[in-house]
Amino acid sequence: MKLILGSGSPRRVEILAVLGLTPDDIRPPDIDEDPLPSELPRPYVDRIIRAKAEAVPSDPGDVVLCADTTVAVGRRILGKPADEAEARAFLTLLGGRRHRVLTGLAVKTDDRLMTRIVESRVKMKRLSKVEMDGYMATGDWQGKAGGYAIHGPAGAFFPWISGSHSAIVGLPMVETAHLLQAAGIEVWKT
């Protein structure tokens, strides 16, 4: 039985390591992650994790783990910004308000597809021009849902979180361990 991580995220590899796991292979799926017209955040995350799990090639007996983290303000999904201008717009929108971070995970075996969605809430402070310019200069906003990663330099902008910190980073530990154990992967095996 091999554990296949369907993600190119180094954070997800790190979180698996905290659980005592090392993926046997890393196979990021190539799917269209654009939201459908009028698609709400939770159904979007559910659709994406299922599509990712189905897109990862696997052999009989393999266990595939995929995840997706989405930032949402109300009904609006904030994906990965296309450029610096969009990242600035996202961070301006998020500044001074609470928003949701939804991380979905899917574990696929030969005969089952198990999913969970973990919703956390965070509040980002309003950024000054100096903070915004400084953060943009780091480039850390690139490739990140909502234009930030809470475990990076942007972590200084969040005075409040409610929920799972590991889910906000990209992989909820409790739910990941539970689903992998249900799939036959032993967590903390020595």
UniProtKB/Swiss-Prot annotation:
UniProt-recorded Gene Ontology molecular function terms: nucleoside triphosphate diphosphatase activity
Catalytic activity: a ribonucleoside 5'-triphosphate + H2O = a ribonucleoside 5'-phosphate + diphosphate + H(+); a 2'-deoxyribonucleoside 5'-triphosphate + H2O = a 2'-deoxyribonucleoside 5'-phosphate + diphosphate + H(+)
A single cellular component GO annotation: cytoplasm
Gene3D superfamilies per UniProt: 3.90.950.10
Predominant place of localization: cytoplasm
Enzyme type, top EC level: hydrolase
Keyword Zinc-finger: no
One annotated GO biological process: nucleotide metabolic process
EC number annotated for this UniProt entry: 3.6.1.9
InterPro entries: ITPase-like_fam (IPR029001), Maf-like (IPR003697)
Needed co-factor(s): a divalent metal cation
Keywords: Cytoplasm, Hydrolase, Nucleotide metabolism
Location in or out of the cell: Cytoplasm
SUPFAM superfamilies reported for this sequence: ITPase-like
Active-site residues from the entry: 68
Family: Belongs to the Maf family.
Function: Nucleoside triphosphate pyrophosphatase. May have a dual role in cell division arrest and in preventing the incorporation of modified nucleotides into cellular nucleic acids.
PANTHER family (UniProt xref): BIFUNCTIONAL DTTP/UTP PYROPHOSPHATASE/METHYLTRANSFERASE PROTEIN-RELATED (PTHR43213), BIFUNCTIONAL DTTP_UTP PYROPHOSPHATASE_METHYLTRANSFERASE PROTEIN-RELATED (PTHR43213:SF5)
Name used for this protein in its record: Nucleoside triphosphate pyrophosphatase 2
Protein species of origin: Jannaschia sp. (strain CCS1)
